[in-house]
Amino acid sequence: MPLGIIGKKLGMTRVFDQEAGIMTPVTVIDVAGNEFAQVKTTETDGYNAVQVAYGDQKEQRVNKPDLGHLKKHGAGPKKIVKEFRFEDGEETPDFSAGHPGAELFQDGQWVDVVGTTKGKGFQGVVKRYKFSGQPDSHGHMMHRRPGGVGAGTWPGRIWKNKKMPGRHGTYRRTTQNLKVVQVRPEDNVILVSGAVPGHKGGYVVIRPSKKKPAPEAAK
């Protein structure tokens, strides 16, 4: 897995290309505050990886094992720690910078964005699982109900994993193949085309696309 970074979704806007006459909706992601927490190697840990920490946090809000781990490697208390693993033979980036940011990406690059979707609360099966519902004809009183949920006398219970009403949303989702429209290192923000999972202020992970290579590798 190539190196990625953690960011905060600030919201959406649009970018207009004067030459092409195209308006592109983009999501603005703030990537300031990333810090290398630990570099793992095959000799010391059995595999190559790097841990990236994000978001300053009060010490009393971080549990002691995590706080001790971060302090051991020279990082302060952080909200999120994410590990990016590198395969054997994969090129590893330079970790001397200490604070990775928007410069890891470039205009025109394809990325995958991982986030947590918006919560919808307690919902029925029509909204939660896209059930078609019951007939809407005259006299019917169960328009949006799921219908039968059990088999009968045997097994005398509802099967596990039966699709039923419940809490909907707050799922971990990955949106693949989003194009980096603009990289602004001076502001430490990245503008990616389209929407990314989650609400404003939600945390996301940005990493190079698995299905589409970076511009240099594509040539």
Regions found by a protein language model. Name each.
Residues M1-K219:
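Extended basic (Lys/Arg/His-rich) segments that typically form rRNA-contacting surfaces
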